[in-house]
């Protein structure tokens, strides 16, 4: 029996709008075909969220075709038929003989598809070279010898940086789920409780969702507890929570690929003077950064508003203050850092990430996900900006 089409997260017209924007960029670059390998970009253009990108797969966009063609491993083709907006004949499953083959892989199936189309090997072809191994990139060049290969690694990412209102609604739902995860952490972090049990409850909340909207995936979760608060990307340990512990939590809600992230710091018992001082300074810095957000301001403006504010309290932050966020946790485009002159536009979304790792054994975290509005910003995450004292 053929697999049925699943419920579509966005209407067909929304996907066609996105594809048309990509085709305009293809015209500017004078390419007739674009090979999209980024899983996040494929989600944006088709609605596909299955985790099959660990083997070669590609979305082929032709300037002459309304719908793209998705070429992926044959066993994953039913998921693509089920999840995407495209007709089933636009999903092509390649043979299992290309899996674990030292001589050929799924990208050979993509090149074969291009070569089967009239003139495909003689026109401009855009390829996301940054996502390919050297060997795979070379394959496109040698097997399409007459084609002008154009690197389009981040072309789609820059287009999807400005969200539609439908996408913003999805990110609001994801932000509410992230907030529910923070609240759950506040409820279950207690002395004597295993860190693993805390995160099991938080993960369950992130999957369960809130307001009738389920979390559709689990993003990475970071639980950096004393004496590991100077680290930023480690998981929970096998230890238990103790009186006097500090916990730096970073989680995200996910709705159909769209991510809204949040960070909060917890103190089990009275916080130290140092922790309270950096918390107070960073809240002021966060408010200064958010007050700078408006169309026409630059990412650098936002970052420097934060840096200048915390410096008045004697603190510095060496790392960037955030990054574009949307499909997947971090979009490979703009950063909230000194010198990034990307101008803010309405419906851009960012994770204002103010984690500050001061010493090897001490750091602090605070963050919000926000969108740029016509007049300023809307903070999507709503958890209180407090030092969460247990």
Curated annotation (Swiss-Prot):
Cite the CDD domains for this sequence: APP_MetAP
Q: Which residues cross the membrane?
A: none
Q: Which residues form a coiled coil?
A: none
One annotated GO molecular function is: hydrolase activity
Record-linked Gene3D superfamilies? Creatinase/methionine aminopeptidase superfamily, Creatinase/prolidase N-terminal domain
**Entry EC number(s):** 3.-.-.-
Q: Does the keyword 4Fe-4S apply?
A: no
Task: List the Pfam families hit by this protein, alphabetically.
Answer: Creatinase_N, Peptidase_M24
Keyword terms of this UniProt record? Hydrolase, Plasmid
Specify whether Protein biosynthesis is a keyword of the entry.
no
Q: Which domain of life is it from?
A: Bacteria
Question: Entry's InterPro entries?
Answer: Creatin/AminoP/Spt16_N, Creatinase/aminopeptidase-like, Creatinase_N, Pept_M24, Peptidase_M24B
Please state which protein family the record places this protein in.
Belongs to the peptidase M24 family.
Q: Which PANTHER family does its entry note?
A: AMINOPEPTIDASE, XAA-PRO AMINOPEPTIDASE P-RELATED
Q: What is the protein name stated in its UniProt record? A: Uncharacterized hydrolase/peptidase y4tL
